[in-house]
Amino acid sequence: MTKGTDKNSNQMLVAHLSMFGACVGWGLMAPIGKEAMLHGVSGLSMVTFRVVGACLLFWLASLFARKEHVSRRDKLMFAGAAVFGLLLNQCCYTLGLSFTSPINASIVTTSMPIFAMLLSALILKEPITGKKALGVLMGCSGALMLILTSAAHVSDKVGDIRGDLLCLFAQFSFALYLSLFNPLIRRYNVFTINRYMFTWATIMLLPFTFGETMATVSSHLSMKTWMEVAYVVGIGTFLCYILTMVGQRALRPTVVSVYNYVQPIVSVFASLLMGVGVLKPTHALAVILVFTGVWLVNKSRARGDAK
């Protein structure tokens, strides 16, 4: 094995571990963030805490990172990336969750890798191979099996088509971000990328949510709730976006998106560890389907292989 091949293998391993780590953080963020929203933090306030808090953390981290020159054109491109990768994705999902049931919202999130596969074919000319399509289908089946069997004994409110459509658009928005801005993401380090994206998102979001967020801040939340918000901002946003960018720089958009199916696994196992869930045989089958799906998508042909 040559040094170049060995280095590339190490980069791919780091990329996959980073995506898995991000999905673990996001999977744990779901129950923790939901708990905070049940105790005084509104959905839009939570989005604002995430965006503004992560913006401040990325500016602070940038003081210790390598300085990079960013062209004026790319600065404007980061504004577009912030719209599709942050604002539309987070705001639509949060608003959708307020209309529909958590189960419906979880089911809708399984559409994102399908959108990513189709958009990558249209925009990046990535081939849709049988192996890739089978991998996405297997991952989707595993995630749906996990969500539906876990929800079988949960009393949940009826879904709402408005909320379902908003959650669906959130997935489409993030898939579009993965395909449109993939070349931009590969040009800069993770701190430069996130600093500009979260700065643009803060500028665009804060004028509309400042009043509601300040009302939340002054509402005497408990220390436990503030700790939950801190997790959502520090781990679920700051750290997870760093890990996602590391993965996105080395992996194809469809591979990045199919890791979305790992999040329900993390949520279920977190509930088992917390003693609020019961392990079922279908959980093991779902895990096998998801990780087999990720493996198949990763092994499918890339654009360069198709030439």
For each of these PLM feature ranges, what is it?
Residues A36, M46, R50, G96, ...:
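Hydrophobic/aromatic residues within transmembrane alpha-helices
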Residues M46-F49, Q90, N104-S111, L180-T202, ...:
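Helix-helix packing/entry segments at the starts of transmembrane helices
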Residues F58, A79, L119, I128-S150, ...:
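Hydrophobic transmembrane alpha-helices of multi-pass small-molecule transport proteins
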Residues T2-F49, D156-P183, I203, P207, ...:
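Glycine-/small-residue-enriched transmembrane alpha-helix faces in small-molecule transporters
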Residues Q11-H16, G40-L44, T48, V70-L76, ...:
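Juxtamembrane helix-entry segments on the extracytoplasmic side of multipass membrane proteins
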Residues G33, L38-L88, F115, S173-L180, ...:
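Transmembrane alpha-helices of multi-pass small-molecule transport proteins
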Residues C23-G27, A81-Q90, P113, I147, ...:
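Transmembrane alpha-helical core positions of polytopic small-molecule transporters
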Residues G25-A30, W59-T109, M145, V233-L251:
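Specific transmembrane alpha-helical segments of multi-pass solute transporters/efflux pumps
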